[in-house]
């Protein structure tokens, strides 16, 4: 009904897509974000290389404004492709940290994660996220949902449409299911 109350949990990752911009603009190890998917798929193992893109501190669930970025596990064999893949995976690890806390606090298990934004175009990242969460990841056809959400809220407020119509109109581009390698 129009009088029903709905709740949402939100967790902020301060640096997500901006970490891919960092690879491009500061490190200059990619020309554009699209190539990160092919590069990530080109190597099998990361061999314990982790990127923490805390360039502006860490958001949820740590809320540490003093944290700074780091790369762990570098060896002489580490190449640009390892740093690229580890940076992509860092986005999924940050999301997992938030989802774990949300599940604990709400006592509700995640069945499906709906994603948006430029990073969700990356199939490698979305599949890695699905595997890491052991949950379905759903990418919509329209990935810039912030503007669309503002429009939906305006339409709801002005009674142009109702919540059920908005839900019905959501179009899915792709669903990623968890795949666990033996």
Identify the role of each PLM range.
Residues 1-182:
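Glycine/Thr-rich phosphate-binding loops that ligate phosphate moieties of nucleotide
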